[in-house]
């Protein structure tokens, strides 16, 4: 993936996010977060990496590698999935899209080399080609006004379901439009060649989209309760513990790690789960802070943020909690703070936007 826009010339603050250098803040993080919540924000996806999977055996091979079902995936549609160890632990997460003649696998840059090397080891006698889409670039767009903004930019929107894609045009630029699945606001991605993406960016900004940096996107991620691999999902975690049941097919048949996933389902033996915490007293806890209830350690914090609100900020955190301590509304201690357990995504009322 190459740089998608000329943000270096705009005086934005840049830095590392999800394994790649990108724009962190364009002007004001608070305003950018509010654009994602109540308007429309456009952002770089320099931390996104795409791989192309082709060859006669691609369906059978890929279906045996990941936790979701691509054997029955219709052309133009995608799924979210995990890559697991034989012990059922999570090596990484990804999205896979069926383009008919090949699959597109999308991962964060921080995971790309590891997952590419890990999966390639299992191509033995299979007729499968698995390679990076090195000349691709992408941008994202999100918010309640996203579809109106796309149309104002001259991009016709086919009726896409979540994780569905279609080819579109914007002036002379050709692109693939991909509908995302963010829980708080509609979101799309535009994939194209590196040479055409800047024209797409300019068209969306002229149509009213607010340039948004990675810091505001991270706030929106936490507000939506979306776990990130390496932050909220680690190799020691099990798929069902993450709460991302959309990543798992229980009917597809064998894949690496399937035996453990099925055993947990059959026995109902899940001892902890991913949840939200709304801080009611004390400072924002740091990731890694222990969660306690009645003097016992019952979980851990993995992410935390101060969400912008009209009257200040709302402190929240994400993390894992043992089931016996995890009833909604229960009060727990997060380091030096007290918090209420809250289901995800967080409920953000009018005062939060």
Question: Predicted regions: what is each one?
Answer:
Residues 189-278:
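Anionic-ligand-binding alpha/beta catalytic cores of soluble enzymes and soluble regulatory domains
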Residues 52-57, 141-145, 278-286:
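Short, surface-exposed ligand-recognition loops at beta-strand->loop->(often short) alpha-helix junctions
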Residues 18, 86-87, 99, 170-173, ...:
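Short strand-coil-strand connectors
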Residues 29-38, 81-93, 123-126, 168-178, ...:
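Short amphipathic beta-strand starts and helix->beta connectors
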Residues 1-80, 84, 89-91:
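Acidic, proline/glycine-enriched N-terminal capping motif
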Residues 41, 50, 72-73, 92-227:
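Acidic, low-complexity central loop/insert segments
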Residues 94, 238, 242-258, 262-353:
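Glycine-rich, small/acidic residue-mixed loop/short-helix segments
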Residues 13-15, 79-84, 161-172, 331-334:
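Short acidic-hydrophobic surface loop/beta-edge motif
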């Amino acid at each position: 993936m190459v740089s998608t826009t000329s943000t270096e010339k705009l005086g934005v603050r840049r830095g590392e996010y999800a394994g790649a250098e990108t724009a962190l803040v364009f002007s004001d993080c608070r305003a950018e977060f509010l654009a994602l919540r109540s308007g429309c924000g456009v952002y770089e996806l320099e931390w996104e990496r795409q791989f192309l999977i082709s060859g006669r055996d691609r369906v059978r091979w890929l279906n045996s590698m990941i936790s979701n079902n691509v054997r029955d995936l219709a052309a133009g549609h995608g799924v979210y999935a995990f890559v697991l160890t034989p012990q059922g632990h999570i090596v990484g997460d990804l999205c896979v899209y069926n383009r008919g003649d090949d699959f597109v696998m999308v991962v964060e840059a921080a995971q790309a080399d590891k997952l590419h090397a890990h999966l390639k080891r299992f191509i033995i006698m299979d007729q499968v080609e698995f390679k990076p889409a090195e000349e691709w670039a992408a941008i994202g767009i999100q918010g309640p006004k996203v579809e109106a903004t796309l149309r104002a930019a001259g991009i016709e929107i086919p009726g896409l379901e979540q994780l569905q894609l279609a080819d579109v045009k914007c002036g002379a630029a050709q692109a693939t439009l991909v509908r995302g699945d963010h829980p708080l606001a509609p979101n799309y991605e535009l994939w194209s060649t590196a040479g055409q993406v800047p024209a797409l960016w300019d068209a969306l900004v002229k149509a009213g989209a607010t340039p948004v940096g990675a810091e505001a996107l991270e706030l929106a991620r936490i507000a939506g309760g979306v776990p990130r691999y390496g932050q909220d999902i680690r190799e020691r975690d099990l798929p069902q513990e993450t709460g991302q049941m959309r990543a798992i097919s229980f009917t597809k048949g064998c894949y690496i790690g399937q035996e453990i996933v099925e055993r947990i389902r059959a026995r109902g033996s899940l001892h902890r789960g991913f949840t939200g915490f709304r801080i009611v007293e004390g400072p924002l806890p740091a990731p890694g802070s222990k969660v306690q209830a009645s003097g016992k350690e019952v979980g851990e914090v993995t992410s935390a943020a101060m969400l912008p609100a009209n009257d200040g900020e709302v402190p929240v955190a994400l993390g894992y909690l043992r089931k016996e301590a995890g009833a909604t509304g229960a009060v727990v201690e997060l380091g030096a703070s007290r918090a209420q357990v809250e289901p995800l995504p967080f409920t953000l009322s009018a005062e939060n936007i």
